[in-house]
Amino acid sequence: GGPGVMEAAIRGASDAKGLNVGLNISLPHEQAANPHVTRELNFEFHYFFMRKFWFVYLAKAIVIFPGGFGTLDEFFEVLTLVQTRKLRKPMAVILYGKSYWSEILNLDAMVKYGTIDPADLELFKSVDSVDEAFAYITGKMEEVLPLPGASL
């Protein structure tokens, strides 16, 4: 992934000697393989739908940073899967950067015009800090994962 936030996350994982997965899309004008991705875990896709399938399949949470059409496509795909309960696992969906997203997305208008339900606005969380994102993710995971020492 890259450039920007995705590249920084991958570089951080690499610097910490952690494994990380690269799910690249072959495009004529961008997205060369990130040199910090774990080589055996670097995959290239021709079709967007296959790339999105794998990142949703592997993810426990998705944090979406400001981006363009591809970012919006990924956000709405994940949100649709969560809304329609096509995912059989909980998924914390986070929009990072409230001021950006409030200008780009007017989901309240969709509620006003009846194209989405007001409850759909609860399918994701908008945040401005790492601490807010972390608290939301851990809260979502605690809803479904047993706590240490708990019996099943």
What are these regions (language model features)?
Residues S14-D15, E77-V82, A109-K112, M141-E142:
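Short, solvent-exposed amphipathic alpha-helical segments in soluble enzyme
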Residues E7, D73, F134-A135:
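Alpha-helical elements of the RecA-like P-loop NTPase motor core of helicases
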Residues G4-I64:
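Acidic/glycine-enriched connector segments
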Residues H46-L95, E143-L145:
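Active-site/ligand-binding-proximal alpha/beta "capping" segment
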Residues L19-E30, F65, L79-E103, P118-A119:
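Short, acidic/small-residue loops that bind anionic groups at enzyme active sites
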Residues L95-L152:
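C-terminal functional extensions of proteins
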Residues I10-G12, A33-P35, E74-E77, L105-L107:
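Short acidic, glycine/serine/threonine-rich loops at helix termini
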Residues G1-M6, F69-T71:
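Gly/Ser/Thr-rich loops at beta-strand to alpha-helix junctions
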